[in-house]
A protein has these predicted regions:
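The feature captures the beta-strand-to-loop junction immediately N-terminal to the Walker
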Residues: 81-83
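Conserved structural motif at the start of ABC-family nucleotide-binding domains
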Residues: 42, 57-58, 65-67
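Conserved ABC ATPase "signature" region
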Residues: 132, 136, 143-161
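Helix-to-loop junction immediately C-terminal to a conserved catalytic motif
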Residues: 96
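Conserved ABC ATPase signature
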Residues: 165-172
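Catalytic Walker B motif of ABC-type/P-loop ATPase nucleotide-binding domains
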Residues: 190-194
Length: 248
C-alpha cells in the first residue's frame, strides 16, 4: 500500500485524515455566525444512503440512512448509539467525506479529525513515521508535528513504541496510534468510531480525561459507542434507529 499524502480525508477511513472545511469533499461552508445561540460546528441534514446487495434476480436495495440529521455545537461531547447495522459507521463516513451520500447536506466549520473503527495503517511505517506523514497532510510544520506527537505519546501512554513498525504492534497500540492520528492537528471537531477497541482500562480512562479536556477547550467530539458506562461522559446521546438519528 502506498501512502497518499495531500489534502482531504484520503482513502475511506485512513486513520484520521480529516482536514479543514475547505478539504472535506462533502463539507459545505459552515453557517455564518449571527446573534443568538453559537453556530454548530457540524450540521447534517436529510442524509440518505442505500446499498445495493446481491446480483442478478437476487439484487436488492438495502436502505441504511433515511433522512438522518444531527448537529454538534462547540464544546459538546455527543454519543452516537444504536444496534449493529443501524447506520452509525455509515453516517460517520459520510460526515467526514469518506463515503458519498445519496442525498442530504453536511456543513462543517473548522478542522476535522476522524478515527475509523478499524485502523487502516501502513504496516512498514513506524508510529513516528505515521505522525510525520499525516502531519504533512494536515499542513503542519516539523516543529508542530514533533510537539503534538510528544504530547500524544504521553497522554495515550505509547511513547516506547514510537520507533516500532505497525506490523509489530499489538491491536491496542494500533488503536492508540489510530486515535493519535485523528488528534494530531488539534481538530475543532473529532469524529470517533469506537475509538477505544483494544484499550486496557488505564488507556480507556486516559481517553475520557483527554476528551474532557477537549470539551473544556471548546472542541467538539462525536463518539460511536456500545458501552452503557460511556453515557455518563456524554452531554447528549443520539440513537440511530430506522435510518434516522433520534435524540434519546
Amino acid at each position: 500500500m502506498t501512502p497518499q499524502v495531500g489534502p482531504g480525508p484520503g482513502p475511506a477511513g485512513v486513520g484520521g485524515l480529516g482536514g479543514d472545511r475547505s478539504r472535506a469533499p462533502l463539507a459545505r461552508d459552515g453557517p455564518t455566525t449571527t446573534e443568538g445561540p453559537p453556530c454548530p460546528v457540524l450540521r447534517a441534514t436529510g442524509i440518505t444512503k442505500t446499498y445495493r446487495r446481491g446480483v442478478g434476480p437476487r439484487r436488492h436495495d438495502l436502505p441504511v440512512l433515511r433522512g438522518a440529521g444531527l448537529q454538534l455545537c462547540a464544546g459538546e461531547i455527543v454519543g452516537l448509539v444504536g444496534e449493529n447495522g443501524s447506520g452509525k459507521s455509515t453516517l460517520m463516513k459520510i460526515l467526514v467525506g469518506a463515503l458519498a451520500a445519496d442525498a442530504g447536506t453536511v456543513e462543517v466549520s473548522g478542522r476535522v479529525g476522524y478515527c475509523p473503527q478499524d485502523p487502516l495503517l501502513y504496516e512498514r511505517l513506524t508510529c513516528d513515521e505515521h505522525l510525520a506523514l499525516f502531519g504533512v497532510a494536515y499542513g503542519m510544520d516539523t516543529t508542530a508535528i514533533d510537539t503534538a506527537a510528544d504530547k500524544l505519546y504521553d497522554s495515550l501512554g505509547f511513547g516506547r513504541w514510537r520507533a516500532i513498525q505497525v506490523a509489530e504492534l499489538s491491536g491496542g497500540t494500533r488503536a492508540k496510534l489510530n486515535l493519535a492520528l485523528a488528534l494530531l492537528p488539534d481538530p475543532d471537531l473529532l469524529l470517533l468510531d469506537e475509538p477505544y477497541a483494544g484499550f486496557d482500562w488505564d488507556t480507556y480512562q486516559r481517553f475520557w480525561e483527554l476528551t474532557a479536556g477537549r470539551r473544556a477547550a471548546g472542541r467538539s467530539v462525536l463518539v460511536v459507542s456500545h458501552f452503557v458506562s460511556d453515557q455518563e461522559h456524554f452531554d447528549r446521546i443520539v440513537e440511530m434507529r430506522d435510518g434516522k438519528a433520534t435524540p434519546r
